[in-house]
């Protein structure tokens, strides 16, 4: 990767659709300039993937990079490669023949393309044994061809992760140390209000305040009281805004529109198996709605 200059960094920030994450983006770019792989982590719905894609598009001059979304069933076959039956049909002769298919990391190295692994910790650590070796030594043995791939000096790797989220695996400390973690958290209220106004410039000020109050309080309940598994994301704020704007324009009163939107997003962030969690979010929605 060509060393990013100040003008590059300014352009990257100005053209990023995710607003309010300037400091995190600058930190990520500084470490990328030093050649480190980056892990963007934080609560879901705050733009980790969009930021990662934006950075890679700028650095790779377009979509000239690989992207894979990790899953629970992912193995080294998907990341590094492995043998695959020549045919999955009922032909017994072909089904006994195998070909070797390179995984996404191997292809990225061979073609000298940058790589994004989204939802990194939704795959078990065992899927990344080869990646661990690559990040530790700069080398990746390709067993079937008895060759060794070398990590290009300008190769960029970005992964995203929701640490501690349901359905994720705990990363080994050794693997985690190979990355520079950059936190993508909730943006401040001032910036979030500007985002709301982009989507609904004419939405009543009281409704906007109610939406932002709801988001702020869910985040407090998550961070300070642990009463919710997560707070409302900026994506959730946008969905509430758009729903209220459309509903009110079609004749629904603001109080009902807000209550509906808050209940909808409340189910997303609450623990649906925990009645107390659902009750907490419903009571919060009704409390804020009562001010309208």
Regions found by a protein language model. Give the residues of each.
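C-terminal regulatory/interaction module of P-loop NTP-utilizing enzymes
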Residues: 1-292
């Amino acid at each position: 990767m060509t060393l990013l200059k100040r003008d590059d960094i300014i352009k990257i920030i100005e053209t990023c659709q995710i607003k309010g994450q300037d400091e995190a983006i600058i930190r990520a770019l500084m470490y990328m300039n030093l050649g480190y792989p980056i892990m963007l982590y934080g609560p879901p719905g705050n733009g980790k993937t969009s930021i990662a894609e934006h950075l890679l598009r700028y650095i790779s001059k377009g979509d000239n990079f690989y992207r894979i979304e990790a899953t629970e069933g992912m193995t080294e076959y998907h990341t590094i490669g492995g043998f695959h039956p020549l045919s999955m049909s009922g032909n017994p002769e072909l089904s006994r023949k195998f070909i070797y298919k390179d995984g996404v990391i191997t292809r990225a190295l061979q073609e000298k393309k940058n790589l994004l692994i989204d939802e990194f910790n939704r795959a078990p650590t065992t899927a990344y044994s080869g990646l661990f070796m690559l990040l530790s030594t700069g080398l990746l043995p390709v067993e079937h061809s008895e060759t060794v791939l070398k990590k290009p000096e300008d190769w960029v790797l970005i992964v995203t992760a929701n640490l501690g989220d349901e359905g994720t695996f705990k990363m080994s400390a050794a693997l985690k140390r190979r990355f520079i973690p950059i936190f993508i958290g909730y943006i401040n209220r001032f910036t979030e209000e500007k985002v709301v106004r982009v989507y609904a410039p004419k939405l009543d000020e009281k409704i906007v305040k109610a939406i932002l109050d709801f988001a702020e309080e869910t985040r407090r309940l998550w961070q300070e009281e642990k009463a919710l598994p997560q707070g409302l994301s900026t994506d959730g704020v946008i969905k509430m805004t758009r729903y209220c704007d459309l509903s009110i324009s079609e004749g629904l009163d603001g109080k009902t529109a807000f209550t509906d939107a808050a209940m909808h997003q409340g189910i997303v962030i609450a623990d649906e198996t925990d009645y107390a969690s659902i009750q907490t979010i419903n009571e919060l929605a009704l409390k804020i709605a009562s001010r309208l």
